[in-house]
Design a protein with these regions (language model features):
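Alpha-helical transmembrane segments of multi-pass membrane proteins
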Residues: 1-17, 132
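Membrane-spanning alpha-helical segments of multipass transporters and channels
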Residues: 12, 22, 32-153
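Short membrane-interface helical motifs at transmembrane helix boundaries
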Residues: 19-28
């Protein structure tokens, strides 16, 4: 309950942001949407759950909310930008860089967003990425619960 209460406001704001960004892409920038809106929404929900759970895990190691926010930015920004496929395609990454690309949720969501927007993909093709995001959510939430129990003891 405690973790869900901390996560819910971020979840709501992030899903609203996703809807606004999709609308802007479609109507302001004229990017055609060819795939499944439900798949993009589902992938977006899983991505937000995974990333907010990662934030909860990082906050378990800090004393203040500001420290948690800064820590999350420092720990996730560079790997997300460099290895998610945002700048360099993940298919061209090798070795440790390729591993880093799979260890953060952003790359998996980027595959979902690009797949639904430009390649007309739906859940039948994007289920591995959705499963990975769900795995991140379960893993980060599970570790957060373990850390919370250790703090209470």
């Amino acid at each position: 309950e405690f973790l869900l209460g901390k996560q819910t406001p971020y979840l709501a704001v992030s899903l609203i942001n996703l809807a606004v960004l999709v609308a802007m892409n479609r109507w302001l920038f004229g990017v055609p949407f060819k795939g499944s809106g439900l798949t993009l929404a589902f992938g977006g929900l899983l991505y937000v759950l995974a990333t907010t759970s990662m934030g909860l895990l990082i906050s378990a190691f800090t004393r203040t909310q500001i420290a948690a926010i800064l820590g999350t930015m420092i720990i996730t920004s560079l790997p997300t930008i460099q290895f998610s496929g945002l700048i360099v395609p993940r298919s061209s990454l090798e070795g440790a860089a390729a591993v880093m690309g799979t260890l953060f949720p952003a790359g998996h969501f980027l595959d979902i967003a690009v797949g639904t927007f430009t390649k007309a993909l739906d859940l039948r093709q994007l289920w591995p990425q959705c499963l990975a995001l769900f795995g991140f959510f379960l893993g980060f939430t599970g570790l957060s619960l373990i850390m919370l129990k250790k703090q209470e003891a």
